[in-house]
Amino acid sequence: MKPTLCFLFILVSLFPLIVPGNAQCSFESLVDQRIKEALSRQEPKTISCTSVTSSGRLASCPAGMVVTGCACGYGCGSWDIRNGNTCHCQCSVMDWASARCCRMA
């Protein structure tokens, strides 16, 4: 056998040991394992929502809840959320305001 061919044969047979493919796979499996462990420790969360309607321009959510949407009387579509828990209808004449309030349970 020629020396070049012999060297090539040795190099090809050692190639799987040189390539760090196993190191990458073990790192990925370690990361996957850690993610699965973290997810298994979490408790499932549910969302709990309710609507609050009041007369006037303001509708406030109960303690611990945040506004996720507002509705206003007289077809008013102009509103904003104040302090994260109160709907404020911005039209000049307003008979009612409603807030959709939610929390994670």
UniProtKB/Swiss-Prot annotation:
Expression triggers: Up-regulated in colon in response to a high-fat diet. Also up-regulated in obese mice mutant for the leptin receptor LEPR (db/db genotype).
One protein family per Pfam: Resistin
Keywords per UniProt: Disulfide bond, Hormone, Secreted, Signal
Cell compartments where the protein resides: Secreted
Signal peptide, first to last residue: 1-23
Alphabetized InterPro entries for the sequence: RELM, Resistin-like_sf
Tissue: Strongly expressed in colon, and at lower levels in ileum. In colon, found throughout the crypt and surface epithelium and in goblet cells (at protein level). Specific to the gastrointestinal tract; not detected in other tissues tested.
CDD domains found in the cross-reference section: RELM
Task of the protein: Probable hormone.
Quaternary assembly: Homodimer; disulfide-linked. Heterodimer with RETNLG.
Protein name per Swiss-Prot or TrEMBL: Resistin-like beta
